[in-house]
Amino acid sequence: MKKTNKAIIYVRGDNRAEQEMICYFYAYRHNIDVLFVTDDIEQVANCEECNMVLVRDASRISRKSIEYYQTVKALNKRGIEVVTTITPENVEFIVNMLKEDLKRGETI
């Protein structure tokens, strides 16, 4: 039986809409079900259904490196993988999709 990936999108700081969009594109490309979007790391840690947290880049977890490593380690211990979605492949996919939309004359 194929494992279903269920994720929470975690956004923090400025440009939340951009962070969310990049994560949704990543989820779409990798067949990941997004349960909800939050800016509360405790909600992520307490989610019993999810096995992933999608973030634009992992530094969004915490600006302080010690807190970052402790948080990621704690999430991993609970079976929640932290996934950075601002990969070159994901950005290229988004750009190419937008170019195709523009060629067809669609508006964003």
Segments (PLM) and residue ranges:
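Short, structured surface patches at the beginning of a domain
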Residues: 1-108
